[in-house]
């Protein structure tokens, strides 16, 4: 793509008024070695159009929410109908109940739910609730799992799995994260050791059931069931962060696939249909501790916004159709099978995985186990960056980081998928060692 001048110009202007020129760091494309991102003008179906009128097949989908594709006509109609009645009330509305009922109906382990405005709000609220319910302060998270930008989550592991958390962002006091313990994903022994060391101090474990913030790493060897057992043995709560996987890998989220019951679940992305929505929910006895039913404070000016609720209701109605996830996963399978076959033909160190409408791309041989954050760091990150640039220049918009999962929508056509596979074949052919 030769024409990028408007994106480049807008980025230079943005740098004057917005830190780093973007409102979320990954959007800057710095992690993939690009000088500037593409500024988007419009989106429809499976496509993005930038300010230079370049067209892209989009495999980010606004980082997951656009499971129906961009600008779904039914969702837009639901939003437009609500717009006539006002933007926001700061008061209860019927749509809140409708979306809550739908979530409780579809998510196997949510009996009550509270709406917030983002995934970060959902996870920080769930942690506060878990601490209050158990009367304990320490939490366990996993290296490489991202739960938003609340202070207690901005922690990197120390020299070993038993290290107390150390902040990995300036501005986060060590005292804030001293109660955040970090373990290795898929390593149950590190969890057991933490409970032995801090018995009766750990309020909860929070985990992405499928780790989508370190590409796409699946739980191994009944890892989630073992977490459930450890929590039960120690009277701690288990929180599934399904902001990414909820209504994305299956109608009932990852918890329905692995048949493991979390005490609390956090949601976002798909439940807003592209509007800013987050939620946390779980067992009624726990959720009844949330104000005003109980003493655990949580509030939000725009929580339960009627426009966002309307978008979410219509989105969940459509993904609830009997054959929706069958069709969606068939598209993901077509893409991943094609990419893996291309790697086999050209003997290229690459493999892809998928589940539901989510996929991961790994620049290493399929025989190489990628089960932890450390494993992912050993893949060929430079080759991913090269692949990203090639695909972007040829009209395919992938996540601008080797640590991010990709998303397919029901709007992607066979032609979109085949074009992606053909371009990948050409890249593998041109970059054979």
Curated annotation (Swiss-Prot):
<keyword id="KW-0413">Isomerase</keyword>
<comment type="subunit">
    <text>Homodimer.</text>
</comment>
<keyword id="KW-0963">Cytoplasm</keyword>
<dbReference type="GO" id="GO:0042286">
    <property type="term" value="F:glutamate-1-semialdehyde 2,1-aminomutase activity"/>
</dbReference>
<dbReference type="Pfam" id="PF00202">
    <property type="entry name" value="Aminotran_3"/>
</dbReference>
<feature type="modified residue" description="N6-(pyridoxal phosphate)lysine">
    <location>
        <position position="269"/>
    </location>
</feature>
<dbReference type="GO" id="GO:0006782">
    <property type="term" value="P:protoporphyrinogen IX biosynthetic process"/>
</dbReference>
<dbReference type="GO" id="GO:0005737">
    <property type="term" value="C:cytoplasm"/>
</dbReference>
<dbReference type="InterPro" id="IPR015422">
    <property type="entry name" value="PyrdxlP-dep_Trfase_small"/>
</dbReference>
<dbReference type="InterPro" id="IPR015424">
    <property type="entry name" value="PyrdxlP-dep_Trfase"/>
</dbReference>
<dbReference type="GO" id="GO:0030170">
    <property type="term" value="F:pyridoxal phosphate binding"/>
</dbReference>
<keyword id="KW-0663">Pyridoxal phosphate</keyword>
<comment type="similarity">
    <text>Belongs to the class-III pyridoxal-phosphate-dependent aminotransferase family. HemL subfamily.</text>
</comment>
<dbReference type="GO" id="GO:0008483">
    <property type="term" value="F:transaminase activity"/>
</dbReference>
<protein>
    <recommendedName>
        <fullName>Glutamate-1-semialdehyde 2,1-aminomutase</fullName>
        <ecNumber>5.4.3.8</ecNumber>
    </recommendedName>
</protein>
<comment type="pathway">
    <text>Porphyrin-containing compound metabolism; protoporphyrin-IX biosynthesis; 5-aminolevulinate from L-glutamyl-tRNA(Glu): step 2/2.</text>
</comment>
<dbReference type="InterPro" id="IPR004639">
    <property type="entry name" value="4pyrrol_synth_GluAld_NH2Trfase"/>
</dbReference>
<dbReference type="InterPro" id="IPR005814">
    <property type="entry name" value="Aminotrans_3"/>
</dbReference>
<keyword id="KW-0627">Porphyrin biosynthesis</keyword>
<dbReference type="InterPro" id="IPR049704">
    <property type="entry name" value="Aminotrans_3_PPA_site"/>
</dbReference>
<dbReference type="InterPro" id="IPR015421">
    <property type="entry name" value="PyrdxlP-dep_Trfase_major"/>
</dbReference>
